[in-house]
Swiss-Prot record:
Entry's localization field: Cytoplasm
Species the sequence originates in: Rhodopseudomonas palustris (strain BisB5)
Protein name: ATP-dependent Clp protease proteolytic subunit
The enzyme's E.C. designation: 3.4.21.92
Molecular function (Gene Ontology), one example: serine-type endopeptidase activity
Major site of localization recorded for this protein: cytoplasm
Domain of life according to the entry: Bacteria
């Protein structure tokens, strides 16, 4: 059976760039990384989180002041993996702009909201979903109680992060996240998860360097 990672890598387009030393080939994502664009795509888990964190740190080392653009299309995933990305976004010096393409659900929506103020965007047909954390555990009764308490602690912390980035009250966030809450791009703007819904890049800012405001 073929390795799915190998199959995927074989499908990634290569681009050729002319340099003073001749031609140089890059896979498309590496070429866009040169333009300080990071893709956060698919389920959030430890492997993906490590790659995103590494790219953020690399781009900070290259230029600690220049904006980093993060394109998000994710159904969410592991809370701790998402928080590793979130903490790194807040830790590094360059401002990180976020743009939702497709969907930003669960931890994806939190990372979308975590972009630099006035630099959080969504395309018009993207969908955003917020909810409280979920989990399961089996074992001794005492261990189950400990894990249940940890989920409650995580719920409280995630609510506080949403409060910080959306400007909503804690009660409003708690009510919104009680069940799966699906938002259109415009609803996400009104809720405070994004700052602007964009459908075109403005002519004066049209470049490969990321989703700057029109």
């Amino acid at each position: 059976m073929r390795d799915p990672v190998e199959t995927y890598m074989n499908l990634v387009p290569m681009v050729v760039e002319q340099t003073n030393r001749g031609e140089r080939a890059y896979d498309i994502f590496s070429r866009l990384l040169k333009e300080r664009i990071i893709f956060l795509t698919g389920p959030v888990e430890d492997g993906m989180s490590t790659l995103v964190v590494a790219q953020l740190l690399f781009l900070e080392a290259e230029n600690p002041k220049k904006e980093i653009s993060m394109y998000i299309n994710s159904p969410g995933g592991v809370v701790t993996s998402g928080l590793a990305i979130y903490d790194t976004m807040q830790f590094i010096r360059p401002p990180v702009s976020t743009l939702c393409t497709g969907q930003a659900a669960s931890m994806g929506s939190l990372l979308l909201a975590a972009g630099h103020k006035d630099m959080r965007f969504s395309l018009p047909n993207a969908r955003i979903m917020v909810h409280q954390p979920s989990g399961g555990f089996q074992g001794q009764a005492t261990d189950i109680m400990l894990h249940a308490q940890e989920i409650l602690n995580l719920k409280k912390r995630l609510n506080e992060i949403y409060v910080h980035h959306t400007g909503q009250t804690y009660k409003a966030i708690e009510d919104a996240l009680e069940r799966d809450k699906f938002l259109t791009a415009e609803m996400a703007r009104e809720f405070g998860i994004v700052d602007k819904v964009i459908d075109k890049r403005a002519e004066e800012t049209a470049s490969a360097s990321g989703p700057k405001a029109p």
